[in-house]
Amino acid sequence: MEVVDPEDRDPDDMLLIDRIGDAVAGDAGNDSDSQEEQLEHQVLEQQLAHHQAHHPLRRDNRHVAMLLDAPLEPPPMGLFEGARAGGVAHPRPPARSKKRSFFTIVRPTVLRNQRPELCPLFLNASRAIGEVREEQRGEFFAEYLFENMTSENYPNGVGLPHHWGQL
């Protein structure tokens, strides 16, 4: 097979290829992508009309100009309705992924990994409270602590809470 340099080609050959393509496509020399270019042209006309309508605001205030020059949100629906009308449908732009807040990320806490430290007095009181009816639990807890928090049960305070973390 012979390799042909593009510069060595006859320019008339390219015209012949264009004419054959026109005959096959049936567009008689009109090489435009009709519906796609029409949609793009409509969008450009809308943007131009938008710019012309707000030109005095843009000229007077720089911040307003920045806001008005931002792309239209959401994009015009005419681009995506072509499939319903029998034309070429353009794919929708991908949706933005939601950014995850670090407040919602689950991390292991101290309470899940280890039990809070409790002194033996409160452990015994909580076990004893389980045997009492719910209406009497507060009163029973106070009585239990009063009776059992004595120097006989806890000589020299050994076993009693010595800092708030043990409660």
UniProtKB/Swiss-Prot annotation:
InterPro entries for the chain: Soti
Origin species: Drosophila ananassae
Glycan attachment positions: N30, N124, N148
Name used for this protein in its record: Male-specific protein scotti
Presence of the UniProt keyword Glycoprotein in the record: yes
Function according to Swiss-Prot or TrEMBL: Post-meiotically transcribed gene that has a role in late spermiogenesis; required for actin cone progression during spermatid individualization.
Any one GO biological process: sperm individualization
Domain of life assignment: Eukaryota
Membership in a protein family: Belongs to the male-specific scotti family.
Key words of the record: Developmental protein, Differentiation, Glycoprotein, Spermatogenesis
